[in-house]
């Protein structure tokens, strides 16, 4: 298998483009409702740290870390997505990117141990099973569809924040975060995308290779 030409083992769904075009049209119509609270984290004079909370399309409160370089002009933005399952690590990890001049946005995915709400029947964290959560329901109710829409809404919020260059949006992540960085680049106007071992990219191949373990174990059911 030539990994440079590999396009996955599943056929593209016939309604793929129409479905996501409708979801993008929907999420772009959702009113922006967010709040920024500055955090006392360090004595760095060139960086500002914020807790960012926003209300998503279904009323869930979603959390993201936000670090903004102090600048007289606009700065590029970097969306950093965390691995599965879990939440964003501490501020130090993101500070490395912010020190390069990027405003960093790092969202906690729903129900994976962070501060974002999963209001799909319960409040609080869940340990696993997110891949198949909602699979017997309408497609719109799958938790990963909701996470993708949260991501797209956060990008709109970033472009609304003063001092962010709306024409220089970038994304990065590893594992689950790599999968989300791929989706982020596909659904949004992204300038650069940095992907490290993208989990979620080809679950059928994982199953065929009999590697449905750990993070993938729910697909065997």
Describe the residue ranges of each PLM region.
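N-terminal targeting or regulatory segments adjacent to alpha/beta-hydrolase or S9 domains
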Residues: 1-47
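N-terminal cap/lid segment of alpha/beta-hydrolase-fold proteins
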Residues: 27-73
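Short beta-strand element of the alpha/beta-hydrolase
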Residues: 64-68, 74-84, 104
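Cap/lid segment of the alpha/beta-hydrolase catalytic domain
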Residues: 89, 95-149, 205-208
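Active-site loop->helix "elbow" adjoining a glycine-rich segment at hydrolase catalytic centers
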Residues: 143, 175-179
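Residue in the alpha/beta-hydrolase core beta-strand immediately N-terminal to the catalytic nucleophile
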Residues: 154, 168-170, 192
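Alpha/beta-hydrolase fold nucleophile elbow
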Residues: 162-175
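Hydrolase active-site cap/lid region
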Residues: 178-221
């Amino acid at each position: 298998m030539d990994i440079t030409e590999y396009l996955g083992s599943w056929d593209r769904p016939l309604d793929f483009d129409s479905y996501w075009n409708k979801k993008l049209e929907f999420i772009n119509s959702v009113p922006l409702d967010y709040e920024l609270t500055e955090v006392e984290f360090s004595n760095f004079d060139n960086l500002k740290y914020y807790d960012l909370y926003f209300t998503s399309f279904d009323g869930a409160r979603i959390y993201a870390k936000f670090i903004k370089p102090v600048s007289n002009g606009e700065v590029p933005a970097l969306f950093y997505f965390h691995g599965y399952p879990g939440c964003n690590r501490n501020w130090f990890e993101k500070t490395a990117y912010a020190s390069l001049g990027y405003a960093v946005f790092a969202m906690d995915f729903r129900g994976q141990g962070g501060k974002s709400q999963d209001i799909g029947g319960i409040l609080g964290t869940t340990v696993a099973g997110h891949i198949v959560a909602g699979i017997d329901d309408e497609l719109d109710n799958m938790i990963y569809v909701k996470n993708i829409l949260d991501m797209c809404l956060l990008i709109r919020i970033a472009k609304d924040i003063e001092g962010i260059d709306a024409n220089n949006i970038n994304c990065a992540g590893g594992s689950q975060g790599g999968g989300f960085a791929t989706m982020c680049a596909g659904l949004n106007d992204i300038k650069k995308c940095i992907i490290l071992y993208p989990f979620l990219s080809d679950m059928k191949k994982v199953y065929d290779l009999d590697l449905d373990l750990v993070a993938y174990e729910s697909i065997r059911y």
